[in-house]
Amino acid sequence: MGRGKIEIKRIENTTNRQVTFSKRRGGLLKKAHELSVLCDAELGLIIFSSSGKLFEYSSASSSMKKIIERYQKVSGARITEYDNQHLYCEMTRMKNENEKLQTNIRRMMGEDLTSLTMTELHHLGQQLESASSRVRSRKNQLMLQQLENLRRKERILEDQNSHLCRLLAEQQAAVEGVQEPLLEFGVFCPPPDNKTAAAANAGPLHLGHHLPAFRLQPTQPNLQESSIVPNRPVLQL
C-alpha cells in the first residue's frame, strides 16, 4: 500500500513540528547542493526556524555576501545597512547646508565679515540692496492698499451723509407743507424744535382768540333758569 498524502497545515505538536523541520531542512539543503553542483547554479538559501535560529547554504564557488550583492544589482533592492548609509549621507548634506545658511544670515546681519574677500563683500552688498528694494516695494504696496481702504471708507461716509441730507430735506418739506394751510387761517406754526415739541406734548393747540362762552336757554319761560348771569349773552332756541 502507498503512503497517504499528508495535509499541508501547521503542526500543532511542538515536538513533532521540530522533528519535521529537521528532516525537511536536511532534504532542502541536500536538494540545493545537488542543484548547485549538477547545474552549476549560483545558489543561496536562508532558513529561520520558528525559534529564530538561522540556517544558510551557498554555492561552493561563491558566498552568501556575493550572492546578496548580485541580487541587489539585478533587482534594485536594498538592505538596511545600505539604507542607513544613504540616510547618514543625506543627514550630513542637510547639516552642511544648514550651517551655510546660518553663516549667510550672520553675514547679512553684519557679523562674521572678516573672512570675506572683496568679491564676496561686493556680492553680499548686491544681495542686501536687492533685499532692501524688495522690502521697499512691499512697504509701498501695503501703503497703497491702506490708502485705497481709507478712500473707500471716505466714499461710504459721503454716501451716508448725502442720504441723511436728503432725509432731512424731505422732512423739512413735509413740515412746510403742513404750515401753509394753517397760515391761511391766521395760524402760524414755527418750525419744530425742542421747546415747541415740549409745548405740544404739554397741552392742546389753541387757535386764534378765545371765543366768549354761550349758554343755551329753552324758550319756555318755566324752563328758564331763575337767575342768569348778567352781561353774558343768551342764545335763544
From Swiss-Prot:
Domain spans labelled MADS-box: 1-61
Superkingdom in the source lineage: Eukaryota
Any one GO molecular function term: DNA-binding transcription factor activity
Role description: Probable transcription factor.
Record InterPro entries: MADS-box/MEF2_TF (IPR050142), MEF2-like_N (IPR033896), TF_Kbox (IPR002487), TF_MADSbox (IPR002100), TF_MADSbox_sf (IPR036879)
Any one Gene Ontology cellular component term annotated for this protein: nucleus
Coiled-coil residue spans: none
Major location (coarse): nucleus
SUPFAM superfamilies documented for this protein: SRF-like
Tissue expression profile of the protein: Expression specific for female reproductive structures: strong at the adaxial base of the cupules, where ovules will later develop, then in the outermost cell layer of the nucellus, in the inner envelope, and in the inner half of the middle envelope at late stage of ovule development.
UniProt protein name: MADS-box protein GGM13
GO BP: any one term: positive regulation of transcription by RNA polymerase II
Alphabetical list of Pfam families matching this protein: K-box, SRF-TF
Residue ranges of domain K-box in the record: 84-174
Location of the protein in the cell: Nucleus
Database matches in SMART domains: MADS
The keyword Transcription belongs to this UniProt entry's keyword annotation: yes
Key word DNA-binding present: yes
PROSITE patterns from the UniProt entry: K_BOX (PS51297), MADS_BOX_1 (PS00350), MADS_BOX_2 (PS50066)
